[in-house]
Each structure stands twice: as C-alpha cells, then as structure tokens.
Amino acid sequence: MIEYRLNGPASQERQRIRLMAALRENRFPQSILIDGPAGIGKKALAIEVAKALQCSDPNMRPCGHCFGCKMAVDRGVTDNWVIPMESKEAHAKSSDDVSAGSTAKTVEDFKQAYIEEIFKNPYRIDVFSAGAEISVGLIRSMTSAFALKGDRVRVVIVAEADRMNDSASNAFLKTLEDVPPNTYFILTTSSREKMLQTIRSRCLALHLLPLSDDEVRSETLRMLGEDADADEVTDDAVGLSVGSPGKALYYVGAGKKWCELAASFVKGSLLADYYDLFTQLSEAELDEAAEANRFLEVVSFLISDLMRAKSGAKLRIPATTALVNIDAFPRVDVAALERALETVQETMSRVASRRTAPPMLLLSLSIKLFEGCK
C-alpha cells in the first residue's frame, strides 16, 4: 500500500490525517474545499495535496522528486492555478495571441507573478488586491486547457474561490457537474458563505483550525528568515494574528502603524480630542474600504482587550492596550466598552457596503464611540 505524508502544523494534523486516509484508501474526492481564517495555511496545504495527487512514487507520496511533484510546484505551469486578478490583468492577451517578439505582458505573465509570490510564502494575506476577482474568462481558460492534459493526473488549485463573480461561479459549477477523469480541484476560501451553495455541496469540506501562539511565533520567524530576531515577532503581532502566521507576518511589518493609530483613535475619542484625532485620520489616508476596515479590525481588537483589562483577563495585545491607559477613565465600564465594540462592528459593515466614504464613517465613529462616557 502506498503511504502518504502531508506536512504542516500540529494544530491541523487531524485534517491532514483525514486527507491522507482518503488518499491511502484510493477514495479521494475530485473536489475539496479548504476553508478557514486568512493566513493559516490553506494554500500551503493545497500545494501539499497537489503534490501527493500527482506523485508517482510507488512507496511514499509526495516524494518531491518525481515529474508529478515537480509539475505541482512549477511556477511556470499557470494552468495548475485559478487565482483572483485585476480586470486589466485578466483581460490581457493570452500568450497564444501575441506576436513573436512582443514585450506586452500576457495574462500568463501576470498569473505567473502571483503564483511565484504564493510559492515564496503561501501564508501571505496580501498577495491579491481587494478589487481582484476570478472572472468567467479565467474559468473558461482553465476548462479549455483540459483537452491538452493527456492522461496525466491534473490538479487545479482555485485560490480564494469566494472571489468568483456570478458568471464565473456558474461556469465553474458546470465544470464540477462533470469533472474530467484524473482531474482534481482544490478550492481555498476564508469566506465560504460567499460561495454558491451548489458549489460547496459538491466539494468535500475541510475546515482548518488556527495555530497555537507558539506555532504562530515559530512559523512567522521561519518566514522572516535565518537572520530574523525573535523580538521582531512581538506579543501584539501574535495576539492580532488570532492563530494566523500570515496575519502575524503582516503585523510584524505594519503592526506598529496600525496599533499606534488605533490607540490614538480610542484615546482621542475618550478625551473628545477630535482635532488631533481628525488630523491623524486624514494623514493615515484610509480612503479605501479594505484599508479602513483593516484599521477598524485593530480598533475592535483593542476594545476587546480593554474589556479583558477591566475583567483582569490575559491581554492579547498588551503593549497597545497599555497606550490607552484605560484606568484613567473610571466612567468607562465593561458595558460601555461592549457598546463601543458593537458600534465599531456596525461601522465596519457600513464601510464594506461602500455607500459612504470611509473617512466620513471614521469621523462619525470617533464621536459616537464613547458618547455619554466622558
């Protein structure tokens, strides 16, 4: 019997055991959906499974050396991936349609650049822009390539599958209804509720769990490289990650900016110091919905930590929470913080709806956040 070994964090071992059993017993489904929070390793697991499915070693898979394993990790084989792309990138000419000697970037060029970034670090949460989507053209390009595959096993990873637009979703659903032989689809998503239920129902569901704090710290240090200082991965970066090495890596680089701004925002609202607060918000340039909500996620986390401070619980972002000095505001109790948290979450929903400019919503939030507690 062929044995299978899928590498990954200990916190996700149960999910890998489930997949390895299906592989070993030759009952692996032709489509699986890996879901879980952003940056916890869904693409990393998808790559491991792709290698295992394409490996030809008679004893242990994936071996990492055979033709199938090499094809699974070949950055130049763009047909192995369906990924979100900007509209101008997705509508670029195909390499089959450009003249010889042309220097114009093709859709394959754009796609390969994204794939290379994924392979460099599959935990990253900022590979694709907020406006990128999976268009119907990308799905049709995938299906048209099926005729060229021959008899070999083919694995297609659909990264961030929730970004399929309506036309792409319907086209992909038709593909799932009649999957070609020896073809497997591995979908990843952080928002499975945004996907068509009919697509979800045709996939084996696999939910990945967040990593432990120790695993996050270890994996983040590994991603930073051999020269990284352990102090770079702060307690606040690990706390904000909520079990996601990808988020921890992001906050190692951008955490200081977001945490200081969030602390100033909350403290400025508590002090009703709106002039300085408005100036800081203006300088932060939070005009895009994605950026505004990323900031509000940190604000939300900070307010939750202030509630922990009030109740004596362990803090998740101690350095940032200390900047607010909540003990200096005795009138702000846990109930007031709960109301503030609800107000932040309501604002995040309004930002996501894109009906009102984010800067206006943030200014309004700063005034309402602790109304009646001054």
Residue ranges and their predicted role:
Residues 1-167:
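Clamp-loader machinery-focused feature within the broader ASCE/P-loop NTPase space
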Residues 155-159, 172, 183-189:
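Structural recognition of the conserved hydrophobic beta-strand(s) that form the central parallel beta-sheet
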Residues 163-164, 178, 194:
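Residues immediately C-terminal
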Residues 1-52, 60, 67, 181-184, ...:
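Charged, glycine-rich active-site and insertion segments that engage polyanionic ligands
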Residues 70-72, 177, 197:
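Short secondary-structure boundary/capping segments
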Residues 144-147, 170-184:
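Conserved catalytic/switch belt of AAA+ P-loop NTPases
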